Amino acid sequence: MRVLGMISGTSHDGIDVAVVRFTLDAGGAQLRGVVEHATTVPYPTALRARVAGALPPAQVGMAEVCALDADLGHAFADAAAEAAAAPDVPEPPDLVCSHGQTMYHWVAEGSALGTLQLGSPAWIAERLGVPVVADVRIRDVTAGGQGAPLVPLLDELLLAGASGRTAVLNLGGIANVTVVGDGADPVAYDVGPANALIDAAVAAAGRGAYDADGALAAAGRVHAPLLDALLTEPYYARRPPKSTGKELFDPGYVDRVRRGAGGAAAADLSLEDLVSTLTELTARVVAQDVRRLDVARLVVSGGGVRNPVLLGALTAAVPGVEVVPSDAFGVSVDHKEAVAFALLGWFTAHGLPASVPSATGASGARVLGSVTPGAGPLRLPTPLSTAPSRLRLTS
């Protein structure tokens, strides 16, 4: 079965797409996946600005919510059609799994109460003529879970059989980690900001969308009073399962912390010093959790891996831990989440639960998503009674 997975993450800079051909080995214990195509399609500048302008704490009307749902749906449909027609995809996909764009993740007093992803899947189904799995988080929320993270499904299967305890870290807008190994159930949660605050600072200064190659951080110095104030964030001390996003770490977050702390923390800083401080914040927060988790290996992915200052600071802060890119396990650091959603779509199509309760806190595993039919009658594979226990990926 060929599945096209799609997601736009908390950096809301574009759509990650992966086309994966899955084959189940005889006996059903091992699933093999060939990543035939993987790419990132940037959002048009105007659409990205509208997404950013609608994120918390902004107040937007329902007309704009409706328009964004349609326009994001068109953007996802365009990206899917482009990937389906790529020369390295020999046949059209049988299924699409689209995460869409998270606009709001409703968490109150540590409990997830709702979640909203825009990008109507009907536009994708109409464009490609195949079924589309979407709205994948809410089923876990209704079961008492956080609705996040969902990537532990991929992490658990991909690292099945690996020796020792391994932490799998994604450095997107938000940093999230999965811990697998030693025969225990996976543990996974959102750690805190990865690129979100850095990107917001760079964008606010009109210097682009992100700190390219960590150049701004490298040119600055860490401002200790501000860093100390930022490290007092209560979220970091909360025990998992937990999830967060730009509902907390929004573009105004740093200014609120500075005003609240006063004194030296509120001093005017150069952009370079601010970005250096925020980069150190991400490295410090992630590293303290990695040390606490007592792992031998850290597998990294996401846009933050392309920032040598961030990755260097993180690596230096976890001596004795082997830091390796996810490429070593057959999945690109840039497209791991798209591959994960292709896998999630395969699970849903076969009637298999894809949530990991030990990661999300749900009362049990659930089959995720809603299915929008394609051009003809909805025909899904015969449901499987047992899920595969391992995944091997190649490209």
Swiss-Prot record:
Q: Which InterPro entries match?
A: Anhydro_N_Ac-Mur_kinase (IPR005338), ATPase_NBD (IPR043129)
Show the GO MF annotations: ATP binding; kinase activity; phosphotransferase activity, alcohol group as acceptor
| Binding positions for ATP per the UniProt entry | 9-16
Q: List where the protein spans the membrane.
A: none
Q: Which family does it belong to?
A: Belongs to the anhydro-N-acetylmuramic acid kinase family.
Function, as annotated: Catalyzes the specific phosphorylation of 1,6-anhydro-N-acetylmuramic acid (anhMurNAc) with the simultaneous cleavage of the 1,6-anhydro ring, generating MurNAc-6-P. Is required for the utilization of anhMurNAc either imported from the medium or derived from its own cell wall murein, and thus plays a role in cell wall recycling.
Name by which UniProt lists this protein: Anhydro-N-acetylmuramic acid kinase
Lineage at the top is: Bacteria, Bacillati, Actinomycetota, Actinomycetes, Micrococcales
